[in-house]
A protein has these predicted regions:
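Acidic, glycine-rich loop-and-strand cores that form catalytic or ligand-binding grooves
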Residues: 329-398
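Macromolecular interaction modules
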Residues: 11, 40, 217-218, 323
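Short, compositionally biased low-complexity segments
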Residues: 32-39, 211-223, 304-313
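Alpha-helical membrane-targeting segments
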Residues: 197-229, 350-357, 361-368
Length: 466
């Protein structure tokens, strides 16, 4: 590891560049899935009761970067308009600072959404390509009286959520002197998936849209308006007991049909039904559920489980608003299960072929997921993170007691996350909702909390946190 303190270092803040100390100089050409998400950075913030050692963190980060040279590289544009990462060990930004206040008692009743940016070393997405801008930043904030907060920003064009957490898990294991699996970076495994449809039809674009002139700009404009206060994240927690009751109810609905649904299917269906009621759309209106999925398990044998990059796709099961409101939990959960089952090796191969063709035709900058384009209208997007190891990121002082991220500006976006170890088996749910629906929830909070937690049994339902 090499560390270069910046000239701005002072008593309360230290900014350094952490490097592996070795560089291959290799150029990693990013895949079509990497390019689809673009060079935006994804934030993660972890709260620890005990104080972390900044010097030791910088040392272990330098060591683990030897296995993750992409993160200490820089992004560059290729002559054909594609993107690559030059593995030149230009380094990772590491900021260490001290807060004047004590550690807040964060949790589902007191999230860290408000002011969470103070724990992050931000990166502007339009200041990444062909610039000396790090693809990963760390900010370590020590709280008055003890405890530390670790905030990360990782460029989404190099890693999806699974890869992100595998890196953090590898770093934490390196920090504790434990082995960690080697990542697989070769993007050719994604290119090798490409299989044009047998009849020549462009079926690979079923969940993608090549936008017309102005449509993408209009979407970005709506997104900027939403980020200026038009969307609020509402948080609530479902206990393990509640989830078990939910799955039992869904299973009972499907008795005799030979259909199976998981606990996550049941929770997803329940959220879709409640949010569908909250949306209050006309009976004949189309309701879509965008199911974001890691496709590694569906293409095993071609894309290794250790693949480190973007391997995410989505499907969009749908029904009318009336059907969503009237169908049983089990029927809707079965539709969710069928939606995930669409992620076959053949479908992923056709999608890769479609994206490759759009890149070769020079139309790739206009390609967007239909799920994102429809987020202001017909689609609720759901990202299930419940199996990611948020509460396993232990840097020698124990697991974090809370994990959080800034509010999502895209309306009708739902994230499902695991709960901390003391609430093992539960789920924390974050819902980005438009202002009008948030107002409805606030005006009748007790009633709506009851709807969300109808499977909780007796007692007060878990509150909604705004």
């Amino acid at each position: 590891m090499t560390t270069s303190p910046a000239a701005t270092e002072n008593r309360t803040k230290r900014s350094s560049t952490v490097r592996a100390g070795e560089a291959s100089g290799d150029r990693l050409r990013l895949s079509v899935y990497d390019m689809l998400v673009g060079p935006i950075s994804t934030p993660r913030v972890f709260f620890y009761r005990e104080t972390l050692d900044g010097e030791a963190l910088r040392a272990s980060l330098g060591r683990v970067l030897r296995d993750f040279p992409v993160l200490s590289g820089r992004m560059q544009k290729d002559p054909d308009g594609g993107l690559s990462v030059l593995c030149n060990d230009a380094g990772v930004r590491f900021v260490e600072t001290y807060a004047s206040g004590p550690m807040p008692d964060h949790g589902p009743l007191r999230t860290a959404k408000k002011g969470i940016e103070r724990y992050l070393s931000m990166v502007l997405p339009f200041w990444v390509v062909d610039r000396d801008t790090p693809l990963f930043t760390v900010k370590l904030t020590h709280m008055k009286g003890g405890g530390s907060v670790l905030g990360f920003m990782m460029n989404h064009a190099v890693a999806d959520g699974t890869s992100y957490m595998r890196f953090l898990e590898s770093w934490s294991r390196e920090h504790r002197g434990l082995d960690h699996p080697a990542p697989h970076f070769d993007r050719e495994v994604i290119a090798a998936l490409a299989v044009p449809s047998a009849d020549g039809a462009r079926t690979g674009g079923a969940h993608l849209t090549v936008t017309r002139r102005g449509r993408k700009s209009a979407f970005v404009s709506r997104l900027l308006l939403a980020s200026a206060g038009g969307v609020t994240t509402v948080t609530t927690r479902f206990s393990a007991t509640e989830l078990a009751a939910m799955k039992d109810a869904a299973t009972a609905d499907l008795a005799g049909t030979q259909r199976w649904v998981s606990t996550n299917d049941a929770l997803t269906a329940h959220l879709w039904k409640v949010l569908g009621t909250l949306r209050g759309r006309p009976d004949t209106a189309s309701e879509r559920l965008g199911l974001i999925a890691d496709f590694r398990p569906f293409v095993s044998g071609v894309v290794p489980d250790a693949y480190w990059g973007n391997a995410i796709t989505n499907t969009r099961p749908g029904m009318t608003a009336a059907e969503l409101r009237s169908r049983s939990l089990g029927e809707v959960a079965a539709a969710v299960r069928a939606g995930y089952a669409e992620n076959t090796k053949e479908r992923i191969g056709e999608e890769v072929a479609f994206l490759d063709a759009e890149r070769e035709a020079g139309r790739f900058p206009r390609v967007m997921t239909t799920m994102a384009l429809d987020s202001f209208d017909t689609t609720i997007a759901l990202n299930n993170w419940s199996k990611l190891p948020f509460y396993d990121i232990d840097f020698g002082t124990g697991a974090p007691f809370w994990y959080d991220f800034p509010s999502i500006p895209i309306p009708w976006t739902v994230h499902i996350a695991p709960t901390p170890p003391d609430q093992d088996g539960g789920r924390d749910v974050y819902m980005a909702l438009p202002r009008a629906q948030v107002r409805t929830l606030r005006e009748r909070e007790r009633s709506w909390a009851g709807r969300f937690h109808r499977y909780a049994g007796s007692g007060e339902p878990f509150p909604l946190t705004f």
